[in-house]
Amino acid sequence: NITACPGTDRCKLANIDSVHLAREIDKRYFRKDMPGKIRIAISACPNACTSESLNEIGITGLRTPIRKPGYCTGCGTCVQFCQEDALVVSEGSIVMDQDRCLDCGTCVRSCVYGLLESEPTAYRITFGGRRGRHPKVGMHLITVNSEEAALLVIDEIIDWIYRYARIGVPIVQQLGVSLNFEEFKANLPKKIPADSIVCQ
């Protein structure tokens, strides 16, 4: 079961082409016989329109802003657009609070002078979320900088579940039993290109 928001084709807030990524995942795993139900949800930005963190596998598109301290005019347009109060004007320049920033990219798009740039688009991948009566937010697994790397991570997750999960038991209930998340997370960077990892 794969769900995706409209993505870059139809949404001005999108950071990634979520529909294309969903189609690529579907091509690889449609009708694959798995030991349990696997829901994959993709949101092209942190607005989380697909509630991706409440799925077994969640993918969120990120855009981390980069300030150019000597060039900012201090007009404050980005401050007005930021919904997290992560930006303030101080002594004629913009100061960013990294702890409050969600990497949504809104400030980058709002800069009328094009002085706010961004890191390469990133894909934050979570695992172990659950919907229903007892919802659970998925745990951060890894953040990568390309669709190709995101697909490699999904390949590793699916293979891991296929090999070790028990049939008929919800995936979330197997974490720490059949599925050792911490061990999987620790070994994952060895299986994907090092230059594609943003953070783990």
Give residue ranges: language-model regions.
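Small-residue-enriched alpha-helical segments and adjacent helix-cap loops
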Residues: 1-77, 81, 100
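A domain-level signal for the structural core that forms small-molecule/cofactor-binding pockets
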Residues: 57-62, 120, 125-131
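A hydrophobic, small-residue-rich beta->alpha segment in the mid-to-C-terminal subdomain
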Residues: 129-166
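Iron-sulfur cluster-binding cysteine motifs and their immediate structural context
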Residues: 77-96, 106-123
